[in-house]
C-alpha cells in the first residue's frame, strides 16, 4: 500500500515521501495516528497544497523538542529508592520512575515511552547514564543518581 507521510517516521521517510508499506502497518498505525494518508490522486493533490503548512508545523514541533532536550540534557536527576545493605535496591527503578523524576525535577513533560534504558532497569544505588528520546532525531543524554531513601 502506498502512503504519503505527513511527518518524519523513523526508518521509513520524511514529510512528503510516498512510500510502500504493508497494509496492516498503514491501517493500524500510520493512518490512525495521523502520520500518513493513503496515496490516492486526490490526496496527492491535497497534500501538495498543504505541504508548506505541514512543513512549518513539523519545524515548530522539532524546535520545541530541541528546546526540551536542551532543558533536560547534561543534568543529574536524583531518585530515592529503598535499598538494603551493599546498595542493592528492594525492587528496581524503571522507566516510569525515571520519567516522573525528570518531569518533576526539570519542569518538562517526559513520557515513559521516551526513556531509553539500554541495560534494563536499575537495581542498585549509583549514577547511571540514560537517553531520553524526545523526538525523531532528538535525543538527550541524562544522568540518574539513585540514592537510598531515608527510612
From Swiss-Prot:
The keyword tRNA processing does not apply. Disulfide bonds: none annotated. Signal peptide: none annotated. GO terms for cellular component: ribonucleoprotein complex; ribosome. Keywords: Ribonucleoprotein, Ribosomal protein, RNA-binding, rRNA-binding. Transmembrane segments: none annotated. The keyword Disulfide bond does not apply. InterPro entries: Ribosomal_bL9, Ribosomal_bL9/RNase_H1_N, Ribosomal_bL9_bac/chp, Ribosomal_bL9_C, Ribosomal_bL9_C_sf, Ribosomal_bL9_N, Ribosomal_bL9_N_sf. GO terms for molecular function: rRNA binding; structural constituent of ribosome. Pfam families: Ribosomal_L9_C (PF03948), Ribosomal_L9_N (PF01281). Belongs to the bacterial ribosomal protein bL9 family. Binds to the 23S rRNA. This is Large ribosomal subunit protein bL9. It comes from Francisella tularensis subsp. holarctica (strain LVS).
Amino acid at each position: 500500500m502506498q502512503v504519503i507521510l505527513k511527518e518524519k517516521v523513523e526508518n521509513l521517510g520524511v514529510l512528503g515521501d510516498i512510500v510502500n508499506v504493508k497494509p496492516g502497518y498503514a491501517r493500524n498505525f500510520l493512518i490512525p495516528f495521523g502520520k500518513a494518508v493513503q496515496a490516492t490522486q486526490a490526496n496527492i493533490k491535497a497534500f501538495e497544497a498543504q505541504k508548506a503548512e505541514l512543513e512549518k508545523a513539523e519545524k515548530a514541533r522539532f524546535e520545541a523538542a530541541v528546546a526540551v532536550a536542551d532543558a533536560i540534557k547534561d543534568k543529574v536527576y536524583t531518585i530515592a529508592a529503598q535499598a538494603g545493605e551493599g546498595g542493592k535496591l528492594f525492587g528496581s527503578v524503571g522507566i516510569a520512575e525515571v520519567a516522573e523524576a525528570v518531569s518533576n525535577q526539570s519542569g518538562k513533560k517526559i513520557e515513559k515511552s521516551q526513556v531509553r534504558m539500554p541495560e534494563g532497569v536499575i537495581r542498585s544505588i549509583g549514577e547511571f547514564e540514560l537517553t531520553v528520546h524526545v523526538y525523531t532525531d532528538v535525543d538527550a543524554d541524562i544522568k540518574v543518581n539513585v540514592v537510598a531513601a531515608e527510612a
